Amino acid sequence: MFAMRYVYLFAICIKFVSSSELGKINNLLQGRLIYTDNSVATNVLESKFPFLKSTCVKDALKLFLPQCIANGLESIDAETRVETAIKLSICEFQASGLGEIPENCMVDDLGSMMDCMFELESSSQWWTTYSGNYQRLSSICYENLLPFEKEQILKLFLNITELYDSFGDDVDTKLNHLMFQMEQDSQNFLDDLARMFRNYDNELRNATESNRIILENDLSFFRNKVNDVLYETSEQLEVQIIEKNSQLMNEVDTVHHIMSDLADELAKNDIKSKINDLKDDSLNNLQDLVEMSNDVKEYYSRNNKLVNTELENFSMGLKKQLGGMSKDLSESQMEAIELLQGFNSILHDSLLPSMTDEIVPEMTNFKNTLLQEWTAITSTLNGDFALWNEEIFSTFNDISEKLNGTKKKLDDIEIRVSLVHKNVMTMMRVLDFMWKTSKMIIRCGYLAVKNKYYWLLCSVVWIWSKYRTSRVNVKMIPIKRYYQWAALLLSIYLGAKTGSLIDF
C-alpha cells in the first residue's frame, strides 16, 4: 500500500509541476529567441529581458563577442576585427542620423568591406569613427561580458527548461499509460471476479432450488404413495373383515361348541394383540419417517441460508476493502498536494544552481527506481490476485463437499425408507396368509360339521373309546388333545413366518 501511495504521489507531483509551473514558464517563454543567423526575440522575452532586444550594435558584435570572451582578443583575426569595427561605425552613423553612408559598407561581403575602407578613408569623419571603434575593440569585449553571460545563462535555462518539460511530459505520458493500463486490468479483473461470483451464485442457487424441489417432490410422492397404500389396504381389510365377520357370526352359531376350545387357545396366545402391536409399530415407523423427512428439509434449508450468509459476508468484506483503498487514495492525494507546495518553493529557490548538476541525474535515477518499484508492485499484485483466487476456489470446494455430504445422507434415508416399505409389505403378506389359513380352517370345520360321514366317524370313535375291549389295551387320545396339537402346530408355523418381522 505504501508503494502504491508513493507511485500515485509521484504521478500527481510530476503532473502538477509539468502542467502548472512549467506550463507558466513555457507560456512566458514560448516565443523565446531562436538563435540562428537572424536572431529575433519575441515580445515576451524582450519585455522580461531587455538585453535580448535586437540592435545594430548587437548584430555587429555577433561574431566578435563570443570569440573574444572565450579565447581573448588576440585569438581574433584581423578580418573579423576590421569587419566588426566597420559595422560599429555604420551603427554610429545610423544612430547620429548621418545621411550619407558608404554603399559598399552596407553589404556583408569581404570584397565590399575593402571597398568600404577605401571610402571611409575619403572622409576624415568616417575614418576617425572607424579608427576609434577598432581601437576600442578590447574594451568593448569586456564591457559586453555581463550581457553576453546573461544571454548565455538564459539560453541554458531555456534549454534545461525544455529538457525538463520534455522529460516531465514523457514521464507523465508513461505514468498515465501505466495507470490507464493498471486501471483497465484492475477493472477487467474485478469484472471477471464479479462475473465469476454471479455465475457461481446462479449455479449454486439453481442447484439448490432443483435439489430442494426434487427432494420435496420425492418425499411428497413417497408419502402420498405410502398413505394411499395404507389407506387402500386398511379399507380393503376393514371391508373384508366386516364381510367375513358377518359370515362368521352366522356360521359360528352352528359350530360354537366345537370351536370353543380352539378359540380359547387362540385367545391365550393373544395373536390379535400381537397384530395390533405390529400395526402400531408400523404406524410409528411411518411417523418417524415423516419427522425425519421434515428434519432433512430443515437441515437443507439451514445449509442454504448458511451459504447465502457466507456469500453476503464475503461481498461485504470485499466492498470494505475497496472502500479502504479509495480512502487511502484520497489521503495520498491530499498528502501530494501538501508536499507539492513545499516542492514548488524549493523548485523556485534552487532551480538555476541545481538544474544542471543535480536534477537531471536525480530524475533519471528516480525514473529507473520508479520503473523497478512499479515492476515489484505489479508482481506483488499478481501474487495477491492469485492468492485471492485460491481462497475463493477453496471456499467453493468446501461448499461442494458439504452438498455432497447432504446428498449421501439423503441416499441413506431413501435406503431406510425402502427397507421400511419392504417390511410393511412383508407384514401385509403374513396377515393375508393368516386370514386365508383361518378361512380355510373355518371352511374345513364347516364342511366337516355338514358331512354325515364325519358325524358317523365321530360316533364310532366315541363308542370305541367308551366301550373298548379288554384284549386291546390301547389308551385313546382325546379329541381335545388333537385340537391342542393343531393349535400348537399353527402357532409354530405362524411364529416361523412372522419371526423376521418381529426381530425388525
UniProtKB/Swiss-Prot annotation:
Cell compartments where the protein resides: Endoplasmic reticulum membrane; Nucleus membrane
Lumenal-facing ranges: 20-452, 503-504
Spans within the Cytoplasmic topological domain: 471-481
Mode of membrane association: Multi-pass membrane protein
UniProt KW Calcium keyword: no
Glycosylation sites: N159, N206, N313, N404
One Pfam family here: Tht1
Record keywords, A-Z: Endoplasmic reticulum, Glycoprotein, Karyogamy, Membrane, Nucleus, Signal, Transmembrane, Transmembrane helix
Protein family per UniProt: Belongs to the KAR5 family.
Name of the molecule in the record: Nuclear fusion protein KAR5
